Amino acid sequence: MKTIKAIIASLALFAMFAGTSAQAKVEIQWWHAFGGRLGELLDEQVNKFNASQNKYTVVHTRKGNYSETLNAGIAAFRAGQHPNILMVFEVGTASLMAAKGAYVPMYQLMKDAGQRFNPKGFVSAVSGYYTTTDGKMLSMPYNSSTPVLWVNKDLMKKAGLDPEMDLSTWKRVGNALDAAKAKGIDMPFCTCWHSWVHLENFSAYHNIPFATKSNGFAGLDTELSFNSPVHIKHIQTLGKWAQEGKFKYMGRRNEAGKNFRAGECMLMTESSAGYAGIKKEAKFEFGIRHLPYYGATEAPQNTIIGGSSLWALSGKSKEENKATAAFLAFLSRTDIQAKWHQDTGYLGVTTAAASATKKSGFYKSNPGTDLAGIQMMRNKVTQNSKGLRLGSFDQIRGIIDEEMEGVYNGTKTA
């Protein structure tokens, strides 16, 4: 009798543990490039998702900057140790699109998981970057931004300038830098992301090609073509300012943002997503303006996006893919997108998020935070302003940065 009771007890215990195992959460991995304030805000999103349901757990890991994260993802995929979700900056989009079999397309992932998904709910100027010519979205836009001009109003006053003065053209910016230099301002101008701001977006904003084949959207056999008179004029101007001490070069990426946040730089061209760090750290009054253009241009066209999208990598189980789909659906929710947009300065990538933000009064109480979206969508896109889709673009950018450094230090001409 005791033996029978022991067997029954053992079976009950086994059933209990089997039930616990069956109810264990499915864990997925997300590799990204965010540290600092953006990393904190990303962590908030993950924690909120994990707490919102009891089926899935997302574990996020920073793998370095954008380039390092992409390279880590590629290496891990080859070794069969890759994450479920990989953050890929816009420069890597063409390379991922060409790597068929390495990812599960967004539209297919959501369909297979039974998740409601409306690609038309995304802002077309953003989603077009990650969508095939026949309208199929391959990855989910996550953090999309565009460059703007940041203004340290306190230093403008110190330079004897009206902090609200017109800075819409590069000529007017040059006049402000002259005044700042004359007043002893050590860093009148600085910039982040040189190629992205001063060649890629510069081209789109002036409606001139950066590369042939509609900047890569119309074919693979693409050639770079940023050698127009206005391109040359702008790079020569930057070089001249650098030689005159009006423009201080701080690094190829967003290193100059640290100087601006510390109150050292008067005018800075940087991503709209600089907002998160500037709002948190700046001890001065700052403003946001549209990216300047050359007055010879009748009117600026539109800028293009930077930032990243999230790719669901292949080779994962059906249950893990369901977890990935659930998490991406969560991230695209209006409330999540609106908060991310307001906290970071990244664009609201869904039309509903932008509408909710406007309705909340956020733009009125935070002047300038709507300029990035206006600047990107001010005109119907052209072949020159739709964006860029070039293979090996990260390497191309590295070469461009090296050449621009030569112009800044006076060893090369535009």
Task: Locate the predicted segments by residue.
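A structural signal for short loop-to-beta-strand junctions that line the ligand-binding cleft
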Residues: 75, 83-84, 115-156, 187-188, ...
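Extracytoplasmic/periplasmic solute-binding protein
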Residues: 131-142, 147, 171-223, 265
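Glycine-centered hinge/linker elements that transmit conformational signals in sensory
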Residues: 174-180, 217-250
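Hinge/lid segment of periplasmic solute-binding proteins
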Residues: 89-148, 174, 200-204, 287-290, ...
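Extracytoplasmic "Venus flytrap"/periplasmic binding protein-like
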Residues: 48-122, 158-165, 259, 264-267, ...
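Long, aromatic- and glycine/proline-rich binding clefts that accommodate carbohydrate-like moieties
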Residues: 289-291, 342-405
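Extracytoplasmic/periplasmic substrate-recognition and gating elements
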Residues: 51-52, 79, 157-159, 232, ...
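Short, solvent-exposed loop/beta-turn-alpha elements that line the ligand-binding surface or hinge
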Residues: 107-122, 166, 208-233, 280-281, ...
